[in-house]
Amino acid sequence: MGKIFYIMGKSASGKDTIYKELIEKIPKFHSIVPYTTRPMREGEKDGVEYFFVDQERFDEMMDEEKIIEFRSYNTKCGIWTYFTADDGQIELWQYDYLVIGTIESYYALKEYFGDDVMVPLYIEVEDGLRLSRALERERAQLKPQYAELCRRFLADAEDFSEENLERAGIKRRFQNIDKETCMEEILREINVNL
């Protein structure tokens, strides 16, 4: 039976960078590309970070009972939904997976697939450094959404509260102060669980 290694962390904790590097270092990993109804950001590609769909397609997939889990956020830019679908991507009898997502989606996938399949990789960064990284990233956008950045920053404090981390069974944290050190620790954790 395969494993799902699940990367999660607050906004601007370095999840996307770590995810991309792990996919390069461990090519046997398959990915589970999540879906979202939010607009594509500068530099993103459909089918890589996310499948970008509209609300109508989300509703169709819900009616077809293909949605494993979903979360909707009332953002400064409208309601954005993120979800994981049973769309044929997941073949645990053959493959191991590397996934990136939220603590809520991790918990839902753990409920769906079981503890023995899910391996949490929680990336943590001190809030001041994280806010600085988020601001730098937002400034690089063609149309920066600073209000949304602030909303996400505050929501992350609640989403990744100690209570929620405990409820999800997340015991280990990977500090992403120095990316190389963080990557080494994550690679060790992956090797122990393969």
Question: Where do the language-model regions lie?
Answer:
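Short beta-strand-centered segment that lines the nucleotide-binding/catalytic pocket of NTP-utilizing
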Residues: 28-41
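Walker A/P-loop
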Residues: 15-16
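ATP-dependent small-molecule kinase phosphotransfer cores
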Residues: 38-97, 101-103
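Hydrophobic anchor at the beta1->P-loop junction of P-loop NTPases
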Residues: 7
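Small-molecule kinase domains that catalyze NTP-dependent phosphoryl transfer to phosphate-bearing small molecules
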Residues: 139-190
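P-loop (Walker A) phosphate-binding loop of NTP-binding proteins
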Residues: 10
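Conserved phosphate-donor/acceptor-positioning beta-strand/loop module used by diverse small-molecule
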Residues: 96-102, 113-137
